[in-house]
Design a protein with these regions (language model features):
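Conserved catalytic core of the tyrosine transesterase superfamily
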Residues: 1-311
Length: 311
């Protein structure tokens, strides 16, 4: 590694920068999924440096270069959330580089994009939920699995990553109520749960019976593919199953995704009379203000001032 005298510059050649990114990722105390997200984000940044010949002058990169990368991202038809995610990964990298006295933080003052207010995905109506479930063919084990999966997510607000981590033994009884213990987003342990109502449990029991005798360590939802038969399902597979069910029910809308079932569960719980505390507990929001967004959106619709206009 060469330095250039008084300046804090370090002439970093591309292989070395990639090595630094690898070291940065290993040094982060974050969940594996977050590490993968950072990795993808930073690989895109490294690729852009090569494409714009900036990899040839890594030692002299400045804040303007980061702003140029941000402008590039904004031309790629990416969502504001994705752009902010990419910028956050770069900020974390340069903050780490500065803390290690390797390179100054040239991202200081660079902001992500402005995120839209409210929640990001549309929610479904009860009629739409019933139609999507009706379209799932339950004549096979795979169909029973998909039905139980869709139904569970719509009734509990589980995230796809939370579903992917669940095991058969995570179904337990608390005070006489069936619950499913889960490892939440960004958590290292299964320290929270969702209630399993009779409506949530019934399809789940039917599906589990088709799999025969299962150990407590068996995945709650298992893959039926030749390559991963019997293994736990990935978040990608879960998302695909939900999306397929929605499309078959005539809801081919990019705004409707597996995460829409989470928004749907929270919204329907509030419509059904859940308090802020109850909805927050089910959604496992650390900040009640996140849950309040759902209340505000529903109030805005039901009590909109536009309805008072008459001429």
């Amino acid at each position: 590694m060469e330095t250039t005298g008084q300046a804090q510059e370090i002439i970093v050649r591309q292989p070395l920068l990639e090595d630094l990114v690898d070291t940065f990722l290993k040094d982060q105390d974050i969940a594996g999924s977050s590490r993968s997200t950072y990795s993808r984000s930073l690989l895109k940044y490294l690729s852009w440096l090569r494409e714009t010949s900036r990899s040839e002058r890594l030692s002299s990169l400045q804040r303007d270069d980061i702003l140029a990368y941000k402008d590039y991202l904004l031309t790629q038809k990416l969502s504001s959330y994705t752009v902010s995610l990419y910028i956050t990964a770069i900020r974390k990298l340069y903050q780490w580089l500065e803390s290690k006295k390797i390179y100054p933080d040239i991202t200081r003052g660079v902001k992500g994009t402005k995120k839209p207010k409210g929640y990001r995905k549309d929610s479904l109506t009860p009629d739409q939920l019933r139609e999507a479930l009706r379209k799932i063919d339950r004549r096979s084990q795979e169909g029973l699995r998909d039905y139980a999966l869709f139904n569970l997510m719509a009734r509990t607000g589980l995230r796809d990553v939370e579903v992917s981590r669940t095991l058969v033994g995570d179904i337990r009884s608390e005070a006489g109520q069936a619950v499913l213990w889960i490892q939440g987003k960004g958590k290292d342990t299964k320290d929270d749960f969702v209630l399993l109502t009779k409506e949530a449990m019934r399809p789940l029991k039917i599906y589990l019976r088709t799999r025969g005798r299962l150990s407590e360590e068996a995945p709650l939802f298992s893959s039926n593919s030749d390559r991963n038969n019997g293994e736990g399902m990935t978040t990608r597979s879960i998302s695909r199953i939900i999306k397929t069910a929605l499309i078959r029910a005539g809801m081919d809308d990019k705004r409707l995704t597996a995460h829409s079932l989470r928004h749907t569960a929270i919204t329907l719980s509030i419509v059904g009379g859940a308090s802020l505390q109850q909805a927050q507990a089910m959604a496992r929001h650390s900040d009640p203000r996140t849950t309040l967004v759902y209340f505000h959106n529903l109030d805005r619709i039901s009590a909109g001032a536009e309805k008072c206009i008459d001429f």
